[in-house]
């Protein structure tokens, strides 16, 4: 490993460390003891799940309590709008247009952050504490302070994510979510053993949980490394005994084309609304809706299943453009044996991608929901879904592949420099 790659890894770790430091900076004017007690008693619902994705920043009411979710939500909205309005889609493909597009995403993130910050501030009044619940200062002052603090925190996370993507290794936003989930693993393990010690769950249940986790990890690794290889040929004339030499190659198409995006998008759409509704303890109707959408309920997991399939198809159509691949092949003198270059190749690739996306979307949806079904059947008293495991393993694999690719690229440049 050369110095450039080592430097990128250190930069990535440095920014992730900064992210974890921010998770310990609380918003001024709140009763942290009341907040902690509230989250201890609500760890099994949407609040607990939202807290997990934020790296326990919510339970500390940190300035990054909203995490990167406002940015993800704004990205979802813009992607859906791009699919609806051709001019917006065209803007994304241009260099200057992409800058304008990202600027719109940032402005939308600011708006969503402010709306969510106000919602959180109002919800804090329902937490047992003083006259204003867990709020220890004037309510109007706190709403301004909390909105500014959370907006600053979310903007900092966006900046950290962009810096990691540009200067570090891997996708910055995915790594932030990865770091948040991983940071909660020690406390989750400790809490599980406490349940064993107190007799809430027995040894057989613990062994069952471990086996489910290991089986989930194995399934994720197996599918994430699976790909369909489409053979292609490049006809090139070479001066070798006056014969043409065909150089064979292939197009790798992953079984899971959409990657980690569908479960992240689905979680973003379900978790925060459920969290806000969970705080509406005074309204019986809203509380009933919150209970209905609890992560431990069937409705939440059915919606998660359906949303993941939708986003898998939607995002696969964005990341895999069969027409562009077919055009690039034709320009470079490549072709798929038995198929006509151009439209015939594009149709074939689109058909293959559609079939793979069907199985890939089902895989994502099942991995995100089946572990919960198994754990619930065992009678375990806490939520365990495969979404967190899926995100952690997928991001780890993707980051390792990018590091490996940069190492190979570095070796190639070294060989080119010495004349090989």
Curated annotation (Swiss-Prot):
**At the top level of its lineage, which domain of life is listed?**
Bacteria
- Annotated localization: Cell inner membrane
SUPFAM superfamilies, per database record: Preprotein translocase SecY subunit
- Transmembrane feature ranges: 9-29, 61-81, 104-124, 141-161, 173-193, 203-223, 257-277, 300-320, 355-375, 377-397
GO MF annotations, alphabetized: protein transmembrane transporter activity; signal sequence binding
The record's listing under PANTHER family reads: SECY/SEC61-ALPHA FAMILY MEMBER (PTHR10906)
Q: How does it assemble?
A: Component of the Sec protein translocase complex. Heterotrimer consisting of SecY, SecE and SecG subunits. The heterotrimers can form oligomers, although 1 heterotrimer is thought to be able to translocate proteins. Interacts with the ribosome. Interacts with SecDF, and other proteins may be involved. Interacts with SecA.
Functional description taken from the UniProt entry? The central subunit of the protein translocation channel SecYEG. Consists of two halves formed by TMs 1-5 and 6-10. These two domains form a lateral gate at the front which open onto the bilayer between TMs 2 and 7, and are clamped together by SecE at the back. The channel is closed by both a pore ring composed of hydrophobic SecY resides and a short helix (helix 2A) on the extracellular side of the membrane which forms a plug. The plug probably moves laterally to allow the channel to open. The ring and the pore may move independently.
Its family? Belongs to the SecY/SEC61-alpha family.
- Provide the protein name: Protein translocase subunit SecY
Which species does this protein come from? Helicobacter pylori (strain ATCC 700392 / 26695)
Q: Which gene encodes it?
A: secY
């Amino acid at each position: 490993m050369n110095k450039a790659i080592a430097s990128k890894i250190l930069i990535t770790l440095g920014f992730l460390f900064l992210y974890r430091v921010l998770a310990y900076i609380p918003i001024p004017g709140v009763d942290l003891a009341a907040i902690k007690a509230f989250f201890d008693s609500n760890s099994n619902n949407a609040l607990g799940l939202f807290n997990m994705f934020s790296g326990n920043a919510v339970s500390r009411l940190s300035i990054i309590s909203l995490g990167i979710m406002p940015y993800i939500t704004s990205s979802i909205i813009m992607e859906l709008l791009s699919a609806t309005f051709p001019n917006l889609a065209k803007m994304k493909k241009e260099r200057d247009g992409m800058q304008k597009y990202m600027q719109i995403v940032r402005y939308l993130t600011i708006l969503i952050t402010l709306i969510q910050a106000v919602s959180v501030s109002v919800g804090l009044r329902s937490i047992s504490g003083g006259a204003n619940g867990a709020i220890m200062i004037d309510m109007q002052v706190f709403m301004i302070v909390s909105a500014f603090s959370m907006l600053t925190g979310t903007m900092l996370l966006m900046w950290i994510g962009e810096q990691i993507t540009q200067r570090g290794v891997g996708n910055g936003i995915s790594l932030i979510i990865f770091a948040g989930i991983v940071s909660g693993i020690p406390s989750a393990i400790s809490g599980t053993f406490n349940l064993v010690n107190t007799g809430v769950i027995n040894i057989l249940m613990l062994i069952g949980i471990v086996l489910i986790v290991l089986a989930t990890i194995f399934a994720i690794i197996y599918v994430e490394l699976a790909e369909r290889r489409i053979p292609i040929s490049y006809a090139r004339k070479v001066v070798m005994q006056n014969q043409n030499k065909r150089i064979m190659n292939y197009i790798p198409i992953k079984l899971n084309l959409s990657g980690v995006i569908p479960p992240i998008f689905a979680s973003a759409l379900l978790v925060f609304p459920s969290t806000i509704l969970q705080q509406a303890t005074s309204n019986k109707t809203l509380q009933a809706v919150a209970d209905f959408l609890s992560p431990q309920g069937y409705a939440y997991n059915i919606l998660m299943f359906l949303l993941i399939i939708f986003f898998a198809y939607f995002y696969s159509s964005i990341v895999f453009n069969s027409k562009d691949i077919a055009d690039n092949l034709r320009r470079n003198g490549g072709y798929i044996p038995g198929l006509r270059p151009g439209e015939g190749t594009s149709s074939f690739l689109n058909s293959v991608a559609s079939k793979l996306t069907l199985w890939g979307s089902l895989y994502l949806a099942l991995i995100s929901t089946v572990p919960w079904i198994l754990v619930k059947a065992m009678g375990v008293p806490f939520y365990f879904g495969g979404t967190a495991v899926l995100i952690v393993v997928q991001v780890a694999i993707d980051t390792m592949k990018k590091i490996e690719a940069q190492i190979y690229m570095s070796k190639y440049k070294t060989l080119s420099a010495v004349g090989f």
